[in-house]
Design a protein with these regions (language model features):
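Structured, charged N-terminal subsegments at the starts of enzyme catalytic cores
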Residues: 207-264
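Short capping segments at the starts of secondary-structure elements
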Residues: 77-80, 146-152
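Short, amphipathic alpha-helical interaction segments positioned at domain boundaries
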Residues: 113-140, 205-225
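Accessory beta->alpha helical hairpin/"wing" motif in late/C-terminal subdomains of nucleic-acid enzymes
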Residues: 41-49, 101-124, 188-209
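N-terminal, charged low-complexity regulatory/assembly segments
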Residues: 137-141, 153, 157-162, 181, ...
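Charge-enriched amphipathic alpha-helical scaffolds
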Residues: 89-97, 163-191
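Basic helix-extension-helix modules of the SAP/HeH family
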Residues: 1-68, 73-111
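Conserved small/polar residues in nucleotide/adenosyl-binding loops
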Residues: 266-270
Length: 270
């Protein structure tokens, strides 16, 4: 059991305990200008300032389960829980400086709580979280069905059947922010500028992934309902499913056979 206690660190100090590469990734995702040799503290200062100015970024970055766990921890200060059950949530929340997990103790950053408590408890935020989870589940359902998808065509399908008001820019921003916490081994292509987003592994020749796609422009996808996409995603355990890297390998090996048209996502590099 892990006891929940207050951290003595400031919010900037908490953020700065993250690996430098994580701070650089987060800075890139939320549009912060930084230098390659910038220190952890300097990056943390810029991130804190950005999140204070734009707290709405937090609900776009963090999954609903992570924010619900954070609210639970705030209510349970001084009590204990089984930390192993919330490993993914703890990882996400530490990434943004809300807490750390040390020596079987969950340390809550009080400065972060003071600054973000009311915004994260609002009804509007709860609605945004539910909307984000809905969109995330649809995207994962598409991933499992098609193997690899293009973000632009993805947006068209979602607009036609599920989110008619969703714009391409909104979908791109959501994915760019949220994939920081998705499982690795996935690749996302932006058809508008041919940019590939990767997380933890690189592809020797990125173009090979899309050769068949380019040659066979007549290829198309069967359309499904929102519930079918979401049920498939949930059936595969979206958040903690270990099969995403295996799916990635399978798609890469079979792309030559025209069995799959290309997305795949990942979370560290662009």
């Amino acid at each position: 059991m892990a006891r929940i206690e207050e951290s003595k660190r400031t919010y900037i100090e908490e953020l700065a305990t993250n690996p430098r590469v994580n701070l650089m990734v987060l800075s890139e995702r939320i549009d912060i200008v930084f230098h390659e040799d910038e220190s952890e503290v300097s990056l943390a200062e810029k991130i804190a300032e950005k999140l204070y100015d734009m707290p709405q970024l937090i609900t776009k970055l963090l999954q609903q389960e992570a924010i619900e766990f954070l609210l639970q921890c705030w209510d349970m200060e001084g009590e204990s829980l089984i930390a192993e059950m919330y490993a993914r949530e703890i990882e996400q929340l530490h990434f943004l400086g809300f807490l750390s997990y040390e020596d079987d103790t969950i340390l809550l950053n009080i400065e972060a709580k003071d600054n973000f408590f009311f915004s994260l408890k609002s009804r509007r935020v709860q609605e945004e979280l539910e909307e984000g989870t809905r969109l995330e589940n649809i995207l994962f359902g598409m991933l499992f069905l098609y193997g690899i998808l293009d973000i632009y065509e993805c947006c068209q399908m979602i607009q036609e059947e599920m989110f008619p008001e969703l714009t391409y820019d909104e979908l791109e921003e959501f994915i760019l922010l949220r994939i920081v916490f998705w499982q690795s081994g996935i690749l996302l292509r932006n058809q508008m500028n041919s940019r590939l987003l990767l997380a933890s592994r690189e592809v020797e020749n990125r173009n090979e992934v899309f050769i068949q796609w380019s040659l066979r422009e007549d290829l198309s996808w069967k359309r499904y309902s929102e519930d079918e996409y979401k049920n498939l995603a949930l059936g595969n355990g979206i958040g903690g499913w270990d099969g995403i890297p295996e799916l990635y390998d399978f798609v890469m090996k079979n792309i030559e056979n025209d069995q799959y048209k290309a997305v795949s996502y990942t979370h560290l590099r662009a």
